Structure formats: C-alpha cells, structure tokens
C-alpha cells in the first residue's frame, strides 16, 4: 500500500477525485486529497507526492488516522508506538525521530518522507528554529488503538547527538 498526497486548488476539486479510500483535508491553507491505494493508483488531477510502500499484514483490517501535526521548536512527543505503520510528509520545519531499532530519521521540507514500521517505539522531537508542520498518516489495526504509550523502552537520545540523514 502507498499513501498518495495530492494538492488541489479548491475543496470541490479534491472531492471530485476523492474515491472510496480518499480523504480531503485542508492544512495550512492548502487542500489535500490523501488516498491509500496501491502504487499504480493516480488521481485525475492534483500535484502529487507518493509515500510507501507501507508494510501491512494481509488479512488484517486497518483504519486510517490523518492528522496535521504542529510542533514548536524543541517540542517532543511522548514516547509511543502504533499497531500499524506511520508516515509523515513535512510541510515546514524539521523533526528527528529515534526508533527502538536504533535508527534515526530526519523529516524536513523537500526531504524524504518519514516511515515507521508497526510496533517500533518512537521518540520524536522538533529540531528546528521554526514551527514544524506535517501531514501524518497512522494506518493502525482497526481492533487496536491508533497510538499507545511506551513504558518499556528508554530512548538513547540519538537525536541530540548531531544526527545525519541516512544514505538514500
């Protein structure tokens, strides 16, 4: 599965392309059609970004939670995990994500989208001097909560040790 993000000039234009797996959302002054489909799906219009593949289990039912996440400089999210993949597309600012598998990912404008596999514990912090804004997808198992707190993992604070983007 892939998360397709298409930007439109108006809400009605996005709704015309919505389809059964799409959601129209306005986020900072722009209209977005967010669709979860296979990699070959295309909207009829819209400026596009494509994120994936998102790893999901066949036979499992998933629900999508779409969020506009806003962080102030230096802000951190409580340590947490999801029962399915999470991805985000950064619109402004920058974040650093440390996961329980020892990886670090940087989310920034014109950078690669951040993708996190199900079940990984996460420590997320805004590492910029401006407000961070991102469109976020949490594709979680329908039978479970979208976000769950972490109590058995202590981050190594890798994001405070001058993280660099991993090689592409």
Predicted regions and their residues:
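Short acidic-glycine-tyrosine-enriched beta hairpin
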Residues: 1-16, 59-63, 71, 95, ...
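Double-stranded beta-helix
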Residues: 39-51, 55-56, 127-168
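Short, conserved beta-strand element in jelly-roll/cupin
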Residues: 70-71, 82-98, 139
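Extracellular/periplasmic catalytic domains that process cell-envelope and extracellular macromolecules
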Residues: 25-27, 59-62, 81, 89, ...
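Short histidine-centered beta-strand/loop micro-motifs
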Residues: 76-82, 99, 106, 125-126
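Flexible, surface-exposed loop/linker segments and immediately adjacent secondary-structure boundaries
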Residues: 27-76
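Ligand-binding loop in jelly-roll beta-barrel domains
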Residues: 19-31, 96, 117-145
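N-terminal accessory interaction module
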Residues: 1-44
């Amino acid at each position: 599965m892939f998360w397709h993000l298409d930007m439109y000039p108006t809400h009605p234009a996005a709704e015309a392309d919505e389809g059964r797996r799409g959601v129209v959302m306005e986020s900072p002054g722009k209209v977005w059609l967010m669709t979860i489909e296979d990699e070959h799906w295309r909207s009829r219009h819209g400026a596009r970004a494509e994120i994936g593949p998102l790893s999901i289990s066949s036979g499992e039912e998933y629900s999508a939670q779409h969020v506009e996440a806003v962080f102030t400089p230096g802000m951190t999210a409580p340590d947490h995990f999801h029962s399915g993949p999470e991805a985000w597309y950064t619109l402004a600012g920058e974040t650093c994500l440390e996961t329980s598998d020892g990886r670090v990912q940087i989310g920034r404008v014109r950078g690669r989208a951040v993708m996190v596999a199900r079940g990984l514990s996460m420590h997320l912090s805004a590492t910029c001097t401006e407000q961070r804004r991102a469109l976020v997808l949490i594709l979680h198992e329908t039978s479970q909560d979208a976000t769950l707190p972490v109590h058995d993992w202590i981050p190594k604070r890798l994001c405070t040790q001058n993280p660099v983007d991993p090689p592409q």
